[in-house]
Amino acid sequence: LLSEEPHQQIQNWYRDLLHLYKKNPALYELDNDPAGFEWINKDDIFRSIFSFVRHSKGKKKNLLFVCNFTPVAREDYRVGVPTKRQCKLVLNSDEKEYGGSGEKRKEIYKPVKKECDGQKYSFAYPLPAYGVAVFEY
């Protein structure tokens, strides 16, 4: 099966997702503690987009997930964040190697003091159709 490009692309995605899991304590340290998870937006039902944060102990290294479950890309999707620290894009399902469009995106996003999703800070991100973006802060 891996000789077919779509299967290879899915394997690439899972390989990198597993790598992200292994190197980020936010994905396993507080699995059984409510402090390890925070909804950012679970109510965007009309656009079928949700976002959440996985926290590490002491909230030193956190991961923000933004997931789009529709075939509609959102060019300047504003996502709320609980920090003004810069957010680094560490995994993007829209990369060519995962079967995405391969459209280039910035690596660093700097939140501004603009309330969104019940958070004091936010930034705009070009969220791809059926896309998942993971940011580290």
Residue locations for each model-derived region?
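Carbohydrate-interacting/catalytic domains
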Residues: 1-137
